[in-house]
């Protein structure tokens, strides 16, 4: 038995933040009904066709769900949704500002149908303030939160190439809902869980925020190198690049003895502690790459392993598909879809009592008629089709 079996989730969701949240609930056994616009569907369905004709974003965050394609702007479509609300345990939405309230699907209205309902509202900036009404996309939140300002090189700031603001919002929505379920169990009370993408990213930005406490100098943009730890990053060998990092004085001593084979550097005035090494990072890099210039990447890794220095490969994405550790730990499964079987990774949290659910990625509106029939609207299906509500 999965932890959330028996829970019904209704989600009006688009793209990443809400879909990632609800996919994780579905992984744990919740039944997730995904409400989509007829004919159009979730915007992410149209982002690309990289996975045998299905969009890569959509494949990632929509397994285990049922797709209900229904027009909520039509009174009959909205009435159907309100009919099933008494049976809904969790309601999730990441609509544009004010849309859920205009539809009568805000928390104050929803709790009239079910006082114990858990409602999760995801938005860019949260309610209120001068930003509450603004549109928000991942890039904008990365920028507003300061992440872009510290990412990149000295010459250019860059965005993180994955939708990290959306992902963080989805993660906090998921954990917030689990907290609300525990609160419901203890008190019998439902909850409204509000998630602001900006606040999610601000939480993740706490280290650089504190680093600049009282207007101190912000972390330097250093590409793949660490702003405040040296050595920590990619260093060139004879035939490639090796990524590694040091964390303490013991590792610096071991690194100098075994990897660089130069013990004079251990207590060198410019390098004897991390603050000095970071101040002189360009010198450290020059010394390291001079020592590595006649060594293959494998030889460098062998020395790092002998010195017990953490290191890793700079893998291309096609190498991640074949990563030996993912295979050794049997992390890959297959999920069904409208185009056949698609490989998918199990969720990262592994529980010894159960394996996460890994069911089909739905086609647009695949479950519309079965859901209408289940909730007593069999006689309305033809009418809804005529009116293009479904």
Residue ranges and their predicted role:
Residues 305-326:
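Conserved PLP cofactor-binding pocket of PLP-dependent enzymes
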